[in-house]
């Protein structure tokens, strides 16, 4: 409606200009009529007519047209005068008079001399009319040019209106599309916000899970540290007890040595006194006895010096132990003070003995003849005491060697535990660093991302990486648990094993029962086969057939019967193995093979068919040519072996992870077989301290000879 109104308003100036042209033509026609033809119009009392003002972009400007009516007194003629104002030298507007009477040209208004002309038919009037025609023709030409300009402007306006309408339609369409797009974008934003909230909740859940796992790891680490600390405290207590016992024994032995020294000095005084007062023969005898006792005194002095050196050695060892444990400082200081006090007492006793010797020299010589027999008895008892002391010293040295071996084992285990702790600390530190880096990366990515699609993709990638890390952490925990389990299997039997081993034993109890039944059947068949082999070769085949027939008839139905039958046949058809090649000696353990090149020790265990033989608490000791020793003890809980079994001890390597091992043990001590190997002694010690010894040759391989039979076996 607005566009139609605009078009009507814009078309009105053209119509007014056409009406004006028609009026001007009619006016020229009326001027050629006689004078008396008059144009009459209805009178209107000063009613101004206003024209529609039109605006154009280039040439048309605002114009105001005023129409005035003037009436003459004689003929009542209404005259209209138009005045137009033009700015900037262009036609700005056109007049549209109210068509009520035929207008006349108001020339007399501008030329006052024309108003005095008498009649219209005068020649001045005709000239005036001619001028008016010229003016009208000029006005017509101007109006035509103005009309052309108006038409061109109107066409341009119509074009612009059409363009405006097209643009308006396009804008409305684009606005609708933008509104639809904005609605879609708002929906997408809502969906993405929901997805983002879900992802953030998932991320928080994952972070909580990681925190819980970290707390579990920390708890496990604290438990392991407590266990290690308890084991270390136990080892320190055992070491302190052993050292205190040794020190007490050393003090007692020193006291006995001091008593013997005092007795020797007393005897020396007797001899010297009798030598002075007696005859020459007795003097010679006493001199010989004196020299002999002097040699013994020197020996005892050497023993004292060696004991002093041992005391110094113990002091040095105590000082070294003082660096490793703070709890031993007070005890070591007390022991050092006791040793110094004893040394002072020894010196005081020596001084007092020397004084007493000077005082009692005369008295002792008088009693010499009476005590010669007693002296001989004392010498004999002294020799016996000497032998007893030597045996005690040997036992003490053996105990010290065992303690050193145990200390080496404990040090190896402590080193392994420290390595495991460092590995766990490193893994926990790396995980913490990775978590912090992932958090930083996630923050940067959340800040740098501009589109929600990219955020979702990155969050999914982060979740996948966290899942992978969780999986890797779980595998790492399983691996560390298996390593701890393998380490606990190698711990000294005096230290109690973890409860996990008992639970694992309960889990595999059913499997062990089936395995024991199968081994029992096989061992019976082997025993029967060995007995038959000693009698006759033909009897062996008959025994095999009978044993296989009995096992097939008495075995269970299904797959278990077929497998046991096959196992029995296989065991009966292998007479050349290491278990069948030697005679069966129940309740014995012997060396079968010692190979220093491939680093393993193979033992042959002969267990009773009823109760079996367990090698728990048995020990292996390797003595190098330079005197250094290393020991390995079999752990508790080893099932008894029935029949002839081969047990292998691998040295210098840890227990393999994820692979079951049967009758195999692992001694993690490294550099056990370093050159030179020749002369290395390998000892097998039973719980009752019975020892079997093997010496390695130059090639480092010892193999039990086939004819030896029982030469290296330890009979229980």
UniProtKB/Swiss-Prot annotation:
Homodimer. Lamin dimers then assemble into dimeric head-to-tail polymers. Ultimately, two head-to-tail polymers assemble laterally into a protofilament with a uniformly shaped rod of 3.5 nm in diameter. Its main location: nucleus. Residues 1-10, 35-45 have a biased composition (Basic residues). It comes from the Eukaryota. It is found in: Nucleus lamina; Nucleus envelope; Nucleus inner membrane. Residues 130-450 form a coiled coil. SUPFAM superfamilies: Lamin A/C globular tail domain. Keywords: Coiled coil, Intermediate filament, Membrane, Nucleus. Residues 1-107, 519-584 are annotated as: Disordered. Residues 132-515 form the IF rod domain. Residues 532-545, 565-584 have a biased composition (Polar residues). A motif (Nuclear localization signal) lies at residues 519-522. Belongs to the intermediate filament family. Disruption phenotype: Nuclei are misshapen and disorganized, with irregularly condensed chromatin and centrosomal detachment from nuclei. Transmembrane segments: none annotated. One of its GO terms (biological process) is centrosome cycle. Residues 62-107, 546-564 have a biased composition (Low complexity). GO terms for molecular function: structural constituent of chromatin. One of its GO terms (cellular component) is nuclear lamina. Lamins are intermediate filament proteins that assemble into a filamentous meshwork, and which constitute the major components of the nuclear lamina, a fibrous layer on the nucleoplasmic side of the inner nuclear membrane. Lamins provide a framework for the nuclear envelope, bridging the nuclear envelope and chromatin, thereby playing an important role in nuclear assembly, chromatin organization, nuclear membrane and telomere dynamics. This is Lamin-like protein. A motif (CAAX motif) lies at residues 713-716. Residues 575-698 form the LTD domain.
């Amino acid at each position: 409606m607005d566009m139609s109104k605009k078009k009507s308003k814009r078309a009105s100036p053209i119509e007014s200009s056409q009406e004006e042209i028609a009026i001007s033509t009619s006016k020229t026609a009326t001027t050629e009529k006689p004078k008396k033809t008059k144009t009459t119009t209805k009178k209107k009392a000063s009613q101004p007519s206003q024209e529609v003002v039109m605006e154009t972009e280039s040439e048309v400007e605002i114009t105001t047209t005023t129409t005035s009516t003037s009436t003459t007194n004689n003929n009542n003629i209404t005259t209209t005068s138009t005045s137009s104002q033009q700015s900037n030298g262009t036609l700005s507007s056109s007049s549209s008079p109210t068509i009520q009477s035929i207008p006349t040209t108001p020339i007399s208004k501008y030329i006052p001399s024309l108003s005095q002309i008498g009649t219209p038919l005068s020649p001045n009037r005709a000239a005036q009319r001619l001028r008016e025609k010229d003016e009208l023709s000029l006005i017509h030409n101007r109006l035509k040019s103005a009309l052309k300009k108006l038409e061109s402007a109107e066409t341009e306006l119509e074009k612009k209106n059409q363009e405006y309408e097209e643009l308006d339609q396009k804008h409305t369409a684009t606005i609708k599309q933008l509104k639809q797009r904005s609605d879609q974008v708002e929906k997408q934003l809502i969906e993405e916000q929901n997805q983002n909230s879900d992802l953030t909740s998932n991320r928080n859940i994952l972070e909580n899970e990681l925190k819980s796992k970290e707390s579990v790891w920390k708890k496990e680490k604290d438990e392991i540290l407590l266990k290690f600390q308890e084991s270390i405290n136990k080892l320190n207590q055992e070491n302190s007890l052993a050292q205190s016992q040794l020190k007490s024994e050393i003090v007692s032995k020193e006291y006995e040595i001091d008593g013997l020294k005092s007795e020797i000095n007393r005897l020396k005084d007797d001899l010297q006194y009798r030598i002075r007062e007696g005859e020459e023969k007795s003097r010679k005898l006493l001199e010989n006895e004196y020299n002999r006792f002097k040699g013994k005194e020197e020996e005892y002095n050497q023993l004292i010096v060696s004991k002093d050196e041992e005391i110094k050695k113990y002091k040095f060892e105590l000082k070294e132990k003082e660096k490793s444990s703070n709890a031993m400082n007070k005890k070591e200081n007390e022991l050092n003070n006791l040793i110094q006090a004893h040394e002072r007492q020894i010196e005081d006793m020596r001084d007092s003995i020397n004084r007493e010797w000077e005082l009692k020299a005369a008295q002792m010589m008088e009693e010499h003849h009476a005590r010669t027999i007693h002296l001989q008895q004392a010498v004999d008892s002294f020799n016996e005491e000497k032998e007893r002391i030597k045996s005690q010293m040997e036992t003490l040295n053996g105990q010290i060697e065992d303690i050193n071996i145990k200390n080496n084992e404990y040090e190896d285990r402590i080193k392994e535990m420290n390595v495991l702790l460092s590995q766990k600390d490193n893994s926990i530190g790396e995980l913490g660093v990775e978590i912090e880096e992932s958090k930083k990366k996630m923050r940067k990515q959340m800040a740098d991302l501009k589109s929600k699609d990219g955020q979702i993709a990155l969050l999914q990638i982060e979740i996948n990486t966290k899942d992978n890390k969780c999986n890797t952490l779980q595998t790492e925990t399983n691996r560390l648990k298996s390593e701890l389990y393998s380490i606990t299997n190698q711990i000294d039997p005096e230290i109690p094993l973890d409860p996990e081993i008992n639970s694992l034993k309960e889990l595999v109890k059913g499997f062990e029962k089936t395995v024991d039944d199968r081994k029992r059947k096989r061992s019976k068949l082997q025993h029967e086969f060995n007995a038959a082999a000693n009698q006759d070769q033909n009897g062996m085949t008959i025994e095999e057939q009978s044993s296989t027939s009995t096992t097939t008839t008495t075995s269970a139905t299904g797959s278990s019967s077929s497998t046991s039958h096959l196992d029995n046949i296989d065991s009966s058809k292998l007479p050349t193995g290491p278990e069948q090649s030697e005679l069966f000696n129940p309740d014995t353990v012997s060396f079968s093979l010692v190979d220093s090149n491939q680093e393993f020790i193979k033992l042959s265990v002969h267990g009773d068919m009823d109760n079996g033989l367990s090698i728990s608490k048995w020990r292996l000791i390797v003595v190098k040519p330079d005197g250094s020793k290393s020991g390995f003890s079999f752990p508790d809980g080893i099932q008894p072996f029935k029949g002839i079994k081969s047990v292998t001890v691998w040295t210098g390597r840890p227990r393999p992870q994820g692979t079951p091992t049967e009758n195999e043990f692992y001694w993690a001590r490294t550099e056990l077989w370093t050159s030179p190997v020749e002369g290395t002694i390998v000892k097998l010690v039973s719980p009752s301290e019975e020892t079997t010894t093997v010496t390695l040759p130059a090639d480092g391989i010892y193999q039990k000879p086939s004819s030896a039979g029982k030469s290296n076996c330890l009979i229980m």
